[in-house]
Structure formats: structure tokens, C-alpha cells
């Protein structure tokens, strides 16, 4: 099977997962103070950071094939996560006079995303037989 096919299938599944997360979060938060906070984007970006670190660490140890790494990393995780939406939503909050909320959102994406990378890498290293 060609690599591009795995990337395409992974991408389709990642896009559907992202859409599903946005529906779930919107339905649960609509009537709360967090209703207009872009929590779905934050969640998929943090989850994607964890998953990419996890799968890449396993791949670097030879525990995941290049085909799976591409299908999951480039395809699924690439479609699940979104830097462009994160940037756009940050700008919208600033333009709406919500600079503090935008700052929280930007810091949340960066700090939680990096923490998720550290956790994903550590978990994969542990499961893969190394530190």
C-alpha cells in the first residue's frame, strides 16, 4: 500500500475526529461561561501534541513502521490539530477586546501543548523499554 493512501485515510479520520470534538465541546459548553472560548481547538491541539510525541518516539525506537508514522502523524494528527484556527481565534479575541482571554488561550496552547509533548514522549519511552 502506498504511503500517500495511509496519509489520506488518516487525514480523513483526523478531520472527522476534530469535527466530532468541536460538536461535543460546543454542545457541552454552550450555556457556560466558557461557551465562547475556543476550547475544542485547544483540546485537539494538546491531544495532537501528545499523540505526535508518542508515535514519533515509538517510531524513532523502531517500534512503529514508517507507513504507520505517516498515516498517524502526518495524516490523522495533521488533520486533527490546527494552527491556523488557533491563530485566527486568537486574533478574533484580540479584535473583540478580549486580550486577556486571548493571552490565556495562546499560553494554554503553548504550555499545555509542550507539557503534552513531554508526557507523550515519556510514556512512549517507558512503553518502548527506555527512559
From Swiss-Prot:
GO terms for molecular function: fluoride channel activity; metal ion binding. InterPro entries: FluC (IPR003691). Na(+) is not transported, but it plays an essential structural role and its presence is essential for fluoride channel function. The chain crosses the membrane at residues 5-25, 39-59, 70-90, 104-124. It is a multi-pass membrane protein. It catalyses: fluoride(in) = fluoride(out). Na(+) binds at residues 78, 81. Keywords: Cell membrane, Ion channel, Ion transport, Membrane, Metal-binding, Plasmid, Sodium, Transmembrane, Transmembrane helix, Transport. GO terms for cellular component: plasma membrane. It holds the Pfam family CRCB. It is found in: Cell membrane. GO terms for biological process: cellular detoxification of fluoride. Its main location: membrane. Belongs to the fluoride channel Fluc/FEX (TC 1.A.43) family. Fluoride-specific ion channel. Important for reducing fluoride concentration in the cell, thus reducing its toxicity. This is Fluoride-specific ion channel FluC 2. It comes from Deinococcus geothermalis (strain DSM 11300 / CIP 105573 / AG-3a).
Amino acid at each position: 500500500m502506498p504511503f500517500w493512501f495511509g496519509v489520506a485515510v488518516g487525514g480523513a479520520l483526523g478531520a472527522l475526529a476534530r469535527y466530532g470534538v468541536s460538536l461535543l465541546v460546543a454542545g457541552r459548553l454552550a450555556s457556560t461561561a466558557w461557551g465562547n472560548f475556543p476550547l475544542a481547538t485547544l483540546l485537539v491541539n494538546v491531544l495532537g501534541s501528545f499523540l505526535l510525541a508518542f508515535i514519533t518516539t515509538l517510531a524513532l525506537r523502531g517500534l512503529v513502521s514508517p507507513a504507520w508514522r505517516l498515516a498517524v502523524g502526518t495524516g490523522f494528527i495533521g488533520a486533527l490539530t490546527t494552527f491556523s484556527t488557533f491563530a485566527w481565534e486568537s486574533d478574533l479575541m484580540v479584535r473583540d477586546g478580549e486580550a486577556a482571554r486571548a493571552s490565556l488561550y495562546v499560553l494554554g496552547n503553548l504550555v499545555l501543548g509542550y507539557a503534552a509533548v513531554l508526557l507523550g514522549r515519556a510514556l512512549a519511552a517507558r512503553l518502548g523499554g527506555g527512559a
